[in-house]
Structure formats: C-alpha cells, structure tokens
C-alpha cells in the first residue's frame, strides 16, 4: 500500500475515534483542502499528528508535531498541545506526548517539581481519551 493512502486511512480512523467520543473531528486536509492544519482537527486544545508506521521514531514525530503546532500558533495565536496518535499494523492506537503536557492535561502538575521536558509518555487510546475528556470538560466549564 502506498504510504500516502495509508496515512489518509490512519487520519480517517483517528477522526472516527474522536467522533465516537462526541467530537466533530475530521481530517485537517479535508477541513480546508490545504496544509497548515493538524492531521485531525475539531478537537479543542490539541494538535494531532497521526502516524501509521511499523518503525516509528516517536521522538521525531513529537518534534514534528511541536514544530507544526508552533507554526500554527504563529499564524493564529491558538496554543495547542501536540500529541502523536500512532499504531503499527494490527495493533491498537496509542497516544504519545511530552510528560509536562500530559501533566497539564491531567491537572496534577505540581509547580515546585522539576520534570525533564524531553520525557515522553505513551499510553493506549482508551486511557488517553479519558484523561483528555476530563481536561476538556473542566477547561470548557461544561
């Protein structure tokens, strides 16, 4: 399968996961027909990078998401937390983000504690979406 088609399918699958959780998610390219958006849009506060790769370098993927979300911030002043949602063939979806970003989502960031900023955390989709939904509900005041 060519990698572009595999990428599109992955983005559609992730958008569907968010839709099943109640979000109006869609592919970023589909959103306006051009680049400059996350791979999946319609999820508040999050920059989503989707990867389907057997040999994924997660650190490089996070760095790409950080660069792209920083560029988006420069254009829009909307600050989004970068997350990479990824899977290998026949495995479940996983979510990886910086530890500091995850702690800001979970609401358990003690300001007096120094945490290495290069620390990455990977968790299953089901665990991550529970943390994210609690954060989003609290932040939106719903």
Predicted regions and their residues:
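Catalytic phosphate/metal-binding cores of nucleic-acid and nucleotide-processing enzymes, i.e., regions
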Residues: 1-142
